[in-house]
Amino acid sequence: MPTIVWTKIDEAPALASYSLLPIVEGFLDGSGIDITTSDISLAGRILAQFPDRLNEDQKVADHLAELGELTGSPDANIIKLPNISASVPQLKAAIAELQSQGYELPDFPDKPSTDEEREIAARYATVLGSAVNPVLRQGNSDRRAPTAVKAYAKAHPHRMGQWTDQVKARVAHMDHGDFFDHEESFVSRGQDLDVVLIGTDGSETTLASGIKTLDGEIVDATFMSVDALDEFYASSLAQANEEDLLWSVHLKATMMKVSDPVLFGHAVRTFLVDVFDKYGDDLNSVGVNPDLGLGDLYTRLEKLPAERAAAIKAAIDFAFAARPALAMVDSDNGITNLHAGNLVIIDASMPTVVRDSGCMWNAEGKRQETLACIPDRSYATMYAAIMDDCREHGALDPATMGDVPNVGLMAQKAEEYGSHPTTFIVPHDGRVEVRCGDEVLTNQQVEAGDVWRMSRVRDIPVRDWVRLAIERARITNTPAVFWLDKNRAHDARVIEKVKAYLPEHEGLDIRILAPADAMKFTLARIRRGEDTISVTGNVLRDYLTDVFPILEIGTSAKMLSVVPLLAGGGLFETGAGGSAPKHVAQFVAEDYLRWDSLGEFCALGACLEHIDQTSEGTKAGILAATLDKAIGAFLENDRSPARKLGQSDNRGSHYWLARYWASELAAQHDDAELADRFSDVATELAAREDQILKELNGVQGSPVDMGGYYHPDEELVAEAMRPSTTFNAIIESL
């Protein structure tokens, strides 16, 4: 029997699953399809790392490893919801919560100095950053807006800020010393590689050894000069001050868990350079690490004598007065862009800047134009191209915009998103060599503090990526653009492979353009209402599948993301919009969850279609077809969660999905048994509408006790997310 694995994850989508999953289980019962769950939440992954410290009844299996093995099976059917990519502050908060619940976990060691602390740090490192996606994404990505979602967005266009040629907001990026500048690339002959740092005194330090590569694998080596980075930040601060722009920094300190926290920390240090220069000894004495942001710094100041802490706070206030205004995350509570590295994440933040006329929030809670700092040129230029296009041609129009689906190269930890184990903060001056035996393959002069990294992409994923791009171009009769820059070392190697693997494609419009040029070409087509497939590497896959959905349909959470696994199974991801902690905060405060589960609905439909194509003896095809019609009715009748208390929230939207789906199943003529089974259910759901909605909406307005944030009490949350006894009884009758 085919089995769907529904992932247990974090925050808003986790809460929504307590309501939605029982409905899905009821509808699939007796269909020849089983459904089970797998815990890959942050708390679950933490507990799985410490079985030796837990009681028998506290131990948790390593579900992520189990799912990783499952991706190698042709029978895999995994619905993967958004999970937390944990920053260090989030990890510490989750550990503290679990400790308070009686789990004897060790503290996270900030600066491990003993073998035991280093071993603990290594275990915790496995759950930091994007620990889940590289394990599960054993295939390339086919991500697009469902037809019904795109049609709804055109009929009900979301708000877009206005653009004129007077808008000063822009992107600032480095022009030397960045990852783009230093990149070297070669194609492996299946060698085992070592990474060695040779000091100025000739001493050798092995940073990594025995790195096994496959024949035809592209290997890159590059580094970020932190001196050049500091120079860039200082220059951009001066520009922002001069032009009265907000200063903002856009990185991905969650996914790029080794490199980007350091880049973020240099932004903090540069902004407060006088404070760190004058009070460095005091700050070091209480363990201040700028990589953790201003929030952590303020917390640690409380450990200093009151007089000393007050002097430092005064110096910080003086720096804020002298610097350009900082972009704010929470103006009411004084939370800035620099408070923590996970608060402003580039793939979500930059599309919002474009949508909001180049603005972010200032300390007064008003929108103000920003200088958006994106240090590395590898991807910054395409964001600059969007803002330049809007400045020249005005805001994009969601009512007429074309569509930009994406085919993304991500299988087998492709490119930068798989580079964490081979990313290093250089401990001293010297040169870093990548060697195979005595053969030196790359050689780069570095200085202490520079961020050096090796990225890789194997040949089979590239072949499959090209195949998938051509397949989507043929099916949709849409131009496909490979976003590759011949002047970037890595991209030049990929271009060689793309040209070698492109099959005969007469009648198809296939292009290879640098990211900025690809963006200009795509935007010109979008403005004419024309569709264009973006074919990108792993990072641009992530960025573009937020940029275009947010501009086209107002959110990336409603995207359909299908990952045809290389082994033949399917991974179905629900949206690209993260796990929405603000939604959880509202739920806890007033029992109202505005998370939109449309992404889950669409992923379930795609999964059922896949099962129908790969398995016999199930009712998956009929379930998928009727679910698709139900989603259409759901959108046409505007049943997504409202944003105001007293109206239907996430739970109410699940009622409407169940009602429309049951109605479609009862009305179809392909399976009499299903029609008969859902006839009474459809009738009951319609007849009890008023009672069900009264029970669902009546609980709103009061605080909710979840019994925990990262590791909530399941009974408490289930009770809160299923408050309608009438609705529950109908679903349980299935």
Descriptions of predicted regions:
Residues 683-684, 690:
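Short, well-ordered surface patches within globular domains
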